[in-house]
């Protein structure tokens, strides 16, 4: 769970909405620091082989099916989600890699 603008956001709820799109093979949502909202969601998406999906289409789908504060602010398309030996998605790794790359710092 992360908190965006004082509201609890459960990644599983957002991920379930994303999996409604047939192009998505894997999806993970993480909360990252945001100066305005405290935290905001970033969607990491791995598409099924041969499929195409644009960020604007994914965001539009989320806007239609989620409360505004639950809609991811950014989408990152990746080949595959990082997993541990038992197959669990390593969201901590996604978060650390994202924050270390270009996410804004909170003062």
State each model region's role:
Residues 96-107:
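Acidic/polar alpha-helix N-cap and adjacent early helical turns
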